[in-house]
UniProtKB/Swiss-Prot annotation:
One of its GO terms (biological process) is DNA catabolic process. InterPro entries: Exonuc_VII_S, Exonuc_VII_ssu_sf. Heterooligomer composed of large and small subunits. One of its GO terms (molecular function) is exodeoxyribonuclease VII activity. The gene is xseB. It comes from Acidothermus cellulolyticus (strain ATCC 43068 / DSM 8971 / 11B). The lineage of its organism: Bacteria, Bacillati, Actinomycetota, Actinomycetes, Acidothermales. Its EC number is 3.1.11.6. Bidirectionally degrades single-stranded DNA into large acid-insoluble oligonucleotides, which are then degraded further into small acid-soluble oligonucleotides. One of its GO terms (cellular component) is cytosol. This is Exodeoxyribonuclease 7 small subunit.
Length: 96
């Protein structure tokens, strides 16, 4: 089974490949600039659009991280579910 590409590897529209931390840091700077106000409308819109793009990059990284963690946990959870706990219904049925 092959692993899905990392979010920064799937940029098929030519966007720069950013790490989660780089995207997050740039997004924070954009939010701070927008919160200060005083920007011309066109620049504010451009920054907002870039912020939306960066938020999507960050979300893709987080979704990928969650999927990787769940993939590692899945075999452990499956094995734990296969083991009958003491006092389970299965054990009670054998006592009849």
């Amino acid at each position: 089974m092959t692993e899905p590409p990392l979010p920064h590897e799937s940029a098929d529209d030519g966007r720069a490949r950013l790490s989660y931390e780089d995207a997050r840091d740039e997004l924070i700077q954009i939010v701070q600039r927008l919160e200060l106000g005083g920007l011309p409308l066109e620049e504010a819109l451009r920054l907002w659009e870039r912020g939306e793009e960066l938020a999507r990059v960050c979300q893709a990284w987080l979704d990928g991280a969650r999927a990787r963690l769940e993939a590692y946990r899945a075999p452990e959870q499956s094995a734990a579910n296969d083991v009958s706990a003491p006092g389970s219904a299965e054990e009670h049925d054998h006592g009849r």
